């Protein structure tokens, strides 16, 4: 099954008051991850109407980013929230007749306290964000998985975070003798983060990412098999990842948690519910 994703840029003011177009970036990714973490803490997660969301203060959001080494100012956080509110996501299933799966922003609803309220009482000036409908759907049909958030937020490389989440979601049968395989071209296609002119540069960047995963004890090591095409040029590279003991233990815990949730959960909405 093939899907097409289109992203429409948001329009927001910069610090000089000029309105510009912004595509969601690494900063917006970090803001969304932090908000999902806050939703799991101290009963901040809420359901209002049909969607899951989170109530928080800008102080809490700033502190969460500061603790993870990604400090942002009040204005930077506000701009990221507004970009997530305005940037459009359009997903359709490609086939004989294209079927629209999703037409929404990253955050359909955003309520931000005023700067005056924030300055007067920063720890109690409440804000609210409604998550994307796909997040709500994942909660309703229990397709989410437990993963190591602290390690995720400690990476210096955006591709490291992408691969970290990919492994936690897909590598459910992680064992020391069961390696995880992927092709360089598949990472380039799926992540959108390998945009170098030469394949050798993509290899270098990806292998720097794998070294970072190794330092974080996610993988024990990796091997690569270079595949050559015409004129002996590199056509693709097959990577084989060897999981660390720490990662295999984490996956066993995540699998048990997922099994417990499915066993103990009440009746759920059907998996193919229209959004």
Give names to the regions the model predicted.
Residues 1-275:
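Charged, alpha-helix-forming regions
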């Amino acid at each position: 099954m093939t899907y097409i994703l289109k992203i429409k840029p948001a329009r927001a003011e910069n610090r000089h008051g000029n309105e510009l177009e912004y595509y969601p970036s690494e900063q917006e990714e970090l803001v969304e991850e932090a908000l999902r973490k806050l939703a799991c803490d101290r009963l901040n997660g809420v359901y209002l109407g049909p969607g899951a969301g989170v109530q928080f203060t800008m102080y809490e959001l700033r502190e969460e980013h500061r603790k993870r080494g990604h400090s942002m100012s009040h204005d930077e956080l506000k701009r990221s929230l507004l970009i997530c509110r305005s940037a459009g996501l359009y997903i359709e299933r490609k086939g004989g007749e294209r079927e629209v799966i999703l037409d929404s922003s990253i955050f359909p609803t955003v309520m931000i306290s005023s700067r005056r309220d924030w300055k007067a009482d920063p720890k109690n000036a409440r804000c609210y964000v409604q998550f994307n409908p796909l997040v709500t759907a994942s909660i309703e049909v229990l397709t989410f998985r437990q993963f190591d958030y602290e390690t995720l937020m400690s990476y210096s490389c955006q591709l490291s975070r992408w691969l970290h989440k990919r492994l936690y979601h897909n590598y459910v049968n992680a064992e020391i003798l069961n390696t995880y395989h992927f092709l360089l071209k598949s990472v380039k296609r799926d992540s959108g983060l390998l945009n170098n002119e030469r394949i050798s540069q993509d290899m270098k960047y990806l292998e720097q990412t794998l070294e970072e995963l190794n330092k974080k004890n996610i993988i024990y090591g990796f091997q690569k098999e270079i595949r050559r095409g015409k004129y002996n040029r590199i056509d693709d590279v097959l990577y084989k990842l060897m999981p660390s003991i720490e990662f295999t233990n984490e996956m066993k815990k995540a699998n048990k948690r997922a099994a417990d949730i499915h066993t103990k959960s009440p009746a759920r909405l059907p998996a193919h519910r229209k959004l």
